[in-house]
């Protein structure tokens, strides 16, 4: 099953934007993802929703951050995270795709910087694959802004992900041996920029319960869509859930 990286990003930014010091929230949700891989239909799966903001570290979904420096306007941290992007040929309906090798999710380590202004927050981050699955790295640059409308909070975000050549080729390339087995043309993916937009809504019910919903859209570049593994040029993700705020 393919799990789009936006599932991780959709809730992580709004948590960071709204959480106060030492705030913990735990919950569960469902994630719907339109996979760009051929042979996949829409995917829906249950996911945990976890957020903690402390003085020296934080948990924002699948990212653990250790704060190196923090001020009113800036935060710099070391990060350890889980990259959920994966491809399992056993879950695919297309015979040719079933002949390809599995692409595993992986652990990432890197650095993240947040800069806060009245008009919003800028995030810049970079992280490398520490399990050597792809031997690649991923960067992100985004801006988001929380808007309060009564009890409802809305957080639109605009950003771009950067996949280096090794990362792109691991998840979207086709080797010569895979080509011979599957009949698909071999393909070497290049580094790629993936723009995305998202909107997250949060609505508290009482003192502790918070309802959440978020939608994200990614436009895939030709470095990815030219791969025979891919049959669409966009990816859509929707996540909804409920959490308990301590």
UniProtKB/Swiss-Prot annotation:
Any GO BP annotation: peptidoglycan biosynthetic process
Signal peptide: 1-21
Entries under Pfam families matching the protein: MipA
GO cellular component: cell outer membrane
Protein keywords: Cell outer membrane, Membrane, Signal
Topology with respect to the bilayer: Peripheral membrane protein
Protein localization: Cell outer membrane
Protein family (similarity comment): Belongs to the MipA/OmpV family.
Name of the protein in its database record: Putative outer membrane protein YiaT
Species this protein is from: Escherichia coli O157:H7
Taxon lineage: Bacteria, Pseudomonadati, Pseudomonadota, Gammaproteobacteria, Enterobacterales
């Amino acid at each position: 099953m393919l799990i789009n990286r936006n599932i991780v990003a959709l809730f992580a930014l709004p948590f960071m934007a709204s959480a106060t010091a030492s705030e913990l929230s735990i919950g569960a949700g469902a994630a719907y993802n339109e996979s760009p891989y051929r042979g996949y239909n829409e995917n829906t799966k249950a996911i945990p929703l976890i957020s903690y903001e402390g003085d020296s570290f934080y948990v924002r979904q699948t990212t653990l951050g250790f704060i190196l420096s923090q001020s009113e306007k800036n935060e710099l941290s070391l990060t350890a995270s889980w990259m959920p992007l994966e491809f399992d040929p056993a879950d695919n309906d297309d015979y040719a795709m079933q002949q390809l090798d599995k692409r595993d999710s992986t652990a990432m380590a890197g650095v993240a910087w947040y800069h806060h202004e009245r008009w919003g927050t800028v995030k810049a981050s970079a992280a490398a694959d520490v399990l050597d699955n792809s031997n690649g790295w991923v960067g992100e640059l985004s801006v988001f802004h929380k808007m309060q409308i009564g009890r409802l909070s809305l957080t639109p975000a605009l950003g771009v992900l950067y996949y280096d050549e090794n990362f792109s080729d691991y998840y979207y390339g086709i080797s010569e041996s895979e080509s011979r087995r599957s009949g698909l043309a071999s393909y070497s993916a290049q580094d790629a920029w993936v723009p995305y937009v998202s909107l997250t809504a949060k609505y508290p019910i009482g003192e502790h319960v918070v309802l959440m919903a978020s939608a994200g859209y990614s436009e895939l570049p030709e470095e990815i869509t030219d791969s025979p593994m891919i049959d669409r040029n966009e990816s859509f993700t929707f996540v909804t859930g409920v959490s308990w705020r301590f």
